[in-house]
Structures are given as structure tokens and as C-alpha cells.
Swiss-Prot record:
Induction of the gene: Zataria multiflora essential oil reduces gene expression. Expression is repressed by curcumin.
Statement: the UniProt record of this protein carries the keyword Acyltransferase: no
Gene encoding the protein: aflP
pH-dependence annotation: Optimum pH is 7-9.4.
Any single GO CC term annotated in Swiss-Prot or TrEMBL for this entry: vacuole
Residues that hold S-adenosyl-L-methionine according to the record: 254-255, 277, 297-298, 313
Matching Pfam families: Dimerisation (PF08100), Methyltransf_2 (PF00891)
Keywords per UniProt: Cytoplasm, Methyltransferase, S-adenosyl-L-methionine, Transferase, Vacuole, Zymogen
Location of the region described as Substrate binding in the Swiss-Prot/TrEMBL record: 206-225
Gene Ontology terms: biological process: aflatoxin biosynthetic process; methylation
The name this protein goes by in its record: Sterigmatocystin 8-O-methyltransferase
Length: 418
């Protein structure tokens, strides 16, 4: 194997050193796992600037790794990275995070065998695969302890999200090539067929599959999405609900069981909220003085006409462009051009060259592609989609969390030109 350029390696090492200095100046002291758990459960998140600087460091480390590995080992290492997910899937399935003690003394392999019933040989290999990715640590032969990462598996939402990623997402990924062949590389107009449907049930999309076939995976998905929800800025941290007139109506389209609307209504009691979702989703949820539950399918024209706000939080990324045009068109027909606005509370992908983008954001994008035919969109892609819906519809403003203007998450405010 040819050695990498000395100048290239030294240049990257110097870049890495400067990036670490900038990150430490921004991030301050490193948080403990307990702080991270508190951050997730209290819905407080690090700043977007801190995230961006962290991912710059990761990207530089990857570039160094690609050079010192050489092209073929680097290529094969990436091709086999699903084996890391397989080991992590087994670890979460066996609940090793609860069996391995978090304390001064490690947990023996014999103890783990007794708790799981799995052979020494298989457990040793599962834990080796995890430990190589700094998830658990073998501190002595057949003696295992927690790392900061493995401790996070004790957080219910994170455990569920990892399980979903190592199960549904990984199996959907294995069907991606078959999906491309079947669809001739053209995305369907809705959620079926998809790589997920090819892996699990050719007649059902993810949400339909969960509700009619596999409620166990469905419950895990809900818990996992709760974990991701806590890492996003709150909509009220971005959009100024106090600016709406007394008695304004906010329609929470696809709002689930109304958690968002109830929370915002407590902070802004001058507003009235209508939460719309499918009957099975809102079943059993009681109305309150400020929040009304309403059965509605986003594929049908919206029955609430002339509302002040139609809010969609993390809805459109679950659907391909054609479906999003249909969903938004069903809202546009209900809007009053003199006062109605649509608020799209979604990720906004940066317009960057592929190699300069954040890997984690790309992984989120590929997750919705594989499971839902969905799409995370850049500003350019959002504008193209919005223009396709209706020539009068335009982005009037993007609301950001204070101090994070231009970050990867914002609320796009759409209005109809009069």
C-alpha cells in the first residue's frame, strides 16, 4: 500500500488541532453522561454552532483515516460497517446495558452468559464489535464495563431509537437495491413501495405496518421518535406565538396526540388549537378548553377554513415530493390569503458539496428515504417544492431559535401572495 502524502497528513493534523481549540472554546467543559441524559429528557440541546464544530472534527478525523487506511481497506471498512450495527442490535436486544454494571467493578462474561442464556463465544464477539466502536469496554479479559456511549442506552428513547436504526432501518437498507430495480430509480408518489415495504410487507408503508401488523415495533418507533423530538428546538423557541392576535386558531396538522399543542397552549393561553390526525392516533384523547382533537387525513382537503396558522412539525420529511405537494395543496385550498399562514417546522439541509456535509444529517435523510420514501430538504429544495404547490405560495420568513440563525432547523413561514 502506498503511503499517504506527508504534506496532506500534516496539513490535516494541523487543521484538526485548530478545530479542537475552537470547539473547546465554544463548548466549554465536557458534559458527563448524566448531563447528556438530563439534556435529552429536559428537551435542552447544544447549540447548532457547537454541533457544526463537532462534526468538522469528525469529518477531519475521517479524512485522516481514509488516507492512512488506503483506498481498498477504507472501502471495505465502509462496506462492512453494517456489522457494527448487527453487534449493537444484538446488544440492545439482550439489554446488555442493564446487565453490565455501572460501577467501580466490571461485569464478568460469566455473569452476562447467566443473565442472557447466550453462549460465551457469541457474547464475546458481540461485545468485541461494540467495544471497537467505544460502546462498552473490555477492561480485562472477559471483564466488561460501561463507556459514556453505552450508558446512554439506559435512556428509554435512545435505546428505542438505536433498536429501530439497527432493525427496521438496516433491513430496509438491505432492500434498497431491489427497490431501485423495481421502481427503475423513480421515487413513488407516496410511501409504498419503499425499501421498508420490500423488507417487511410489500402492501404496507411503515405507519400502516405498525398500526395493523406489528404494534411492538410501532411502540418502539414511537419511543424512539420521542427521543429525537427532544433533540430538536421547540417550535415556540423559534416562532413567536405571542405575535398572534387574541383568539387566533392554530391547526396542528398531523399533530399526533396533541402534546405540542397542549404545551404551547399553556404558554400562550390567548390561542385556540385544533389537533388533526387519524382516528386511531387521537382515539381516547380528551379535548381541553384550548385544544380540540379532530379526525383528519392529510390526503384530504383540510376542513378548517381560514385558520390563522396551519402548523406542520416534522411531517413533510416523511413523504416524497409528490405527496408533499398533495398535502400542502389540501391546506392551500383552506387558507384565507388575508391572514392564513403555513408554518413548516422542519430540518433545513445546508447547500454544501457532498463531502463537506454533516454525515449525521445525511444519515437522517437516508433513514427517511429507506423507511418512508421521505426526504430532508435544503433551502433550494424547499423553495422548489413550495413553488410547485401553488404559484402564489411563497416563503415569507424563516424563524430560527435565537442565536442560531441559518442553522439546520427552522420554521418556514409560508403565505399566499394577495
Amino acid at each position: 500500500m502506498a503511503l499517504p502524502s506527508k504534506a496532506a497528513l500534516v496539513g490535516l493534523a494541523n487543521t484538526l488541532s485548530e478545530q479542537v481549540k475552537r470547539y473547546l472554546a465554544t463548548a466549554g467543559e465536557t458534559k458527563s453522561p448524566e448531563d447528556h441524559k438530563l439534556c435529552i429528557e429536559s428537551e435542552r440541546t447544544p447549540s447548532s454552532n457547537e454541533h457544526a464544530q463537532a462534526w468538522e472534527i469528525v469529518r477531519t478525523c475521517d479524512r485522516i483515516g481514509s488516507l492512512v487506511h488506503g483506498p481498498v481497506p477504507w472501502l471495505l471498512s465502509n462496506a462492512l460497517s453494517h456489522l457494527d450495527s448487527a453487534c449493537l442490535a444484538a446488544a440492545t436486544h439482550l439489554n446488555l446495558q442493564d446487565i453490565i454494571v455501572d460501577g467501580p467493578s466490571p461485569t464478568s462474561l460469566d455473569t452476562i452468559v447467566a443473565a442472557t442464556g447466550v453462549s460465551e463465544d457469541l457474547l464475546r464477539r458481540i461485545l468485541r464489535g461494540c467495544a471497537q466502536r467505544f460502546i462498552f469496554e473490555e477492561v480485562a479479559p472477559d471483564q466488561y464495563a460501561h463507556t459514556d456511549a453505552s450508558k446512554m442506552l439506559r435512556v428509554t428513547g435512545i435505546h428505542a431509537l438505536v433498536g429501530f436504526s439497527c432493525d427496521e432501518v438496516m433491513r430496509s437498507g438491505a432492500s434498497f437495491s431491489d427497490f431501485l430495480q423495481q421502481t427503475k430509480g423513480k421515487p413513488p408518489s407516496w410511501n409504498v413501495p419503499s425499501p421498508f415495504s420490500l423488507a417487511f410487507d410489500p402492501t404496507k408503508g411503515l405507519f400502516d405496518y405498525y398500526s395493523t401488523v406489528d404494534e411492538v415495533r410501532g411502540r418502539r418507533f414511537d419511543l424512539g421518535m420521542g427521543g429525537t423530538e427532544a433533540t430538536k428546538p421547540l417550535v415556540e423557541e423559534m416562532f413567536d406565538f405571542s405575535s398572534l392576535p387574541e383568539g387566533s386558531t392554530v391547526v396542528d396538522v398531523g399533530g399526533g396526540r396533541g402534546h405540542l399543542s397542549r404545551r404551547v397552549s399553556q404558554k400562550h393561553p390567548h390561542l385556540r388549537f385544533i389537533v388533526q390526525d387519524l382516528p386511531a392516533v387521537i382515539h381516547g384523547v380528551e379535548d381541553t378548553d384550548k385544544v380540540t382533537m379532530m379526525e383528519h387525513d392529510i390526503r384530504r382537503p383540510n376542513p378548517v377554513r381560514g385558520a390563522d396558522v396551519y402548523l406542520l412539525r416534522s411531517i413533510l420529511h416523511d413523504y416524497p415530493d409528490a405527496a408533499c405537494v398533495e398535502i400542502l395543496s389540501n391546506i392551500v385550498t383552506a387558507m384565507d390569503p388575508s391572514k392564513s399562514r403555513i408554518l413548516l417546522d422542519e430540518m433545513i439541509m445546508p447547500d454544501l458539496l457532498a463531502q463537506d456535509s454533516q454525515r449525521f444529517m445525511n444519515q437522517i435523510d437516508m433513514t427517511v428515504v429507506l423507511t418512508l420514501n421521505g426526504k430532508e430538504r435544503s433551502t433550494k429544495e424547499w423553495n422548489s417544492l413550495i413553488t410547485t404547490v401553488d404559484g402564489r405560495l411563497e416563503t415569507e420568513k424563516i424563524w430560527w431559535r435565537k442565536g442560531e440563525e441559518g442553522s439546520h432547523w427552522g420554521v418556514q413561514q409560508l403565505r399566499l401572495r394577495k
